[in-house]
């Protein structure tokens, strides 16, 4: 590696599944940049020491994934508005030694819905999960006009309540329920979002196709495998689907732009990912 090479990375645990290195390295190559992007496994218990190590090597920037999106905030120097609203960080830029945190998941989540011209007015949303990814969903939905209600279904009810309070503070009506009961409310929902890791290991979804409304939108943030059980069920129910890779590209593109100041080569990023996945049918 040349001394002038800028190094970026992603930190989380587990990390072996991450496609961010392949996608971002494809983006750097497409723009002819002397940059490289690697993955580091960082459990939450080792987060403080890992951030200190990244400072010591003068890392150019990095992404943060589960379980570190909320805990990392206290080790950063500055937070951009998106990170404050989501109370979570997924992107950090090193600005002359200042670690500034952003949440590009907020933009990354909403952009595929905007492209589909989804109407949020009067919308009832079912959100599965209450972790860092779910925080970005709530922050993104709070910026849309007219969302009627968000039901947060999660195993840990305390975390669900904390997220509901975040949503309520943004002017949205939020309710909580156990994850196991999600199928009871899903038939009444216009948008179903999976912000858990359920499906990453080919697990069955907590919502089967009989409990998905025809014409609703089902959004699975899991991107590997490309087609999860929830996505399969959504297709059977004749719902519209949003794939996790779409959010991955958009949040990654925004991170790329923060780091480089250049427009992201989205086509190259998408081509790289779909070369790994294969085109969805």
Question: Which residues does each PLM region occupy?
Answer:
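Glycine-rich adenosine-cofactor-binding loop
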Residues: 12, 101-103, 121-143, 154-159
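Rossmann-like adenosine-cofactor binding region
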Residues: 170-241
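Conserved beta-strand positions in the Rossmann-like core of class I SAM-dependent methyltransferases
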Residues: 38, 151, 242
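Adenosine-phosphate binding glycine-rich loop
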Residues: 221-281
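Phosphate/diphosphate ligand-binding glycine-rich loop within oxidoreductases
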Residues: 2-116, 225-227
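Short, conserved loop/helix-junction motifs that constitute active-site signature segments
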Residues: 2-4, 120-121, 144-146, 207-216
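Residues at the starts of beta-strands that form the adenosine-phosphate
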Residues: 7, 36, 124, 148-149, ...
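NAD(P)-binding Rossmann-fold cofactor-contacting core
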Residues: 144-170
């Amino acid at each position: 590696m040349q001394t002038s090479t800028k190094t970026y990375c992603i930190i989380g645990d587990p990390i072996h599944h991450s496609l961010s290195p392949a996608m971002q390295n494809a983006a750097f190559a497409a723009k002819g940049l002397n940059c490289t992007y690697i993955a580091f496994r960082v459990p939450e218990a080792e987060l403080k020491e890992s951030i200190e190590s990244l400072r010591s090597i003068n890392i150019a920037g990095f992404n943060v994934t589960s379980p570190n999106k909320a805990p990392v905030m206290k080790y950063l120097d500055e937070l951009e508005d998106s990170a404050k609203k989501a109370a979570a960080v997924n992107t950090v830029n090193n600005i002359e030694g200042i670690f500034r945190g952003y949440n590009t998941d907020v933009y990354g989540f909403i952009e595929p819905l905007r492209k589909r011209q989804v109407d949020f007015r009067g919308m009832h949303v079912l959100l599965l999960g209450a972790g860092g990814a779910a925080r970005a969903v709530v922050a993104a939905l709070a910026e849309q006009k007219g969302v009627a209600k968000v039901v947060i279904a999660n195993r840990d009810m305390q975390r669900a309540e904390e997220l509901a309070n975040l949503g309520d503070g943004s002017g949205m009506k939020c309710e909580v329920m156990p994850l196991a009961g999600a199928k009871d409310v899903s038939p009444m929902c216009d948008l179903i979002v999976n912000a858990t890791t359920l499906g990453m290991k080919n697990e069955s979804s907590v919502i089967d196709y009989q409990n998905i409304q025809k014409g609703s939108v089902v959004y699975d943030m899991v991107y590997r495998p490309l087609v999860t059980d929830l996505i399969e069920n959504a297709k059977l129910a004749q719902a519209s689907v949003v794939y996790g890779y779409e959010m991955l590209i958009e949040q990654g593109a925004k991170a790329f732009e923060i780091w480089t100041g250049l427009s992201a080569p989205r086509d190259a990023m998408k081509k790289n990912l779909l070369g790994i996945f294969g085109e969805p049918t």
